[in-house]
């Protein structure tokens, strides 16, 4: 810098010091904002991971429920066959009782 009065050099130094202070404050604010954004992104990632885990658990529960429903349908079919067989036996019962009483006479 060219020679100048000590007063102008002091003002220039103060001006530079003020600009540096402003830049440092701006950088500090930017770092804080960036840190908040990173933390928010990190939390979003955690929430997304938890949502994925919950979805897998729900999918497993749905598959288990479907399997249970298939088994229940098979059991229902078997019970219907048994009910039909019992119904036929009940319908034939009076005929058998009549035959038995006729034989015992």
From Swiss-Prot:
InterPro entries attached to this UniProt entry: BORCS7 (IPR032143)
Gene Ontology biological process terms, A to Z: axon development; lysosome localization; motor behavior; neuromuscular process; organelle transport along microtubule; regulation of endosome size; regulation of lysosome size; response to cycloheximide
Transmembrane segments: none
This protein's GO CC annotations: BORC complex; cytoplasmic side of lysosomal membrane; lysosome
Subcellular location(s) per record: Lysosome membrane
Pfam families attached to this UniProt entry: BORCS7
Superkingdom: Eukaryota
Predominant localisation class: membrane
Alphabetically ordered keywords of this record: Lysosome, Membrane
Membership in a protein family: Belongs to the BORCS7 family.
Subunit annotation: Component of the BLOC-one-related complex (BORC) which is composed of BLOC1S1, BLOC1S2, BORCS5, BORCS6, BORCS7, BORCS8, KXD1 and SNAPIN.
Function: As part of the BORC complex may play a role in lysosomes movement and localization at the cell periphery. Associated with the cytosolic face of lysosomes, the BORC complex may recruit ARL8B and couple lysosomes to microtubule plus-end-directed kinesin motor.
Protein name: BLOC-1-related complex subunit 7
Encoding gene, per UniProt annotation: Borcs7
């Amino acid at each position: 810098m060219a020679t100048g009065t000590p007063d102008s050099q002091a003002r220039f130094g103060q001006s530079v010091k003020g600009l540096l202070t402003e830049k440092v404050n701006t950088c500090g604010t930017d770092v804080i904002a960036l840190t908040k954004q990173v933390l928010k992104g990190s939390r979003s990632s955690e929430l997304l991971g938890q949502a994925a885990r919950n979805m897998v658990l729900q999918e497993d529960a749905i598959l288990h429920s479907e399997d249970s429903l298939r088994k229940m349908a098979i059991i229902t079919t078997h019970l219907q066959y048994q009910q039909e067989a019992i119904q036929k036996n009940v319908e034939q019962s009076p005929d058998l009782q009549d035959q038995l009483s006729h034989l015992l006479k």
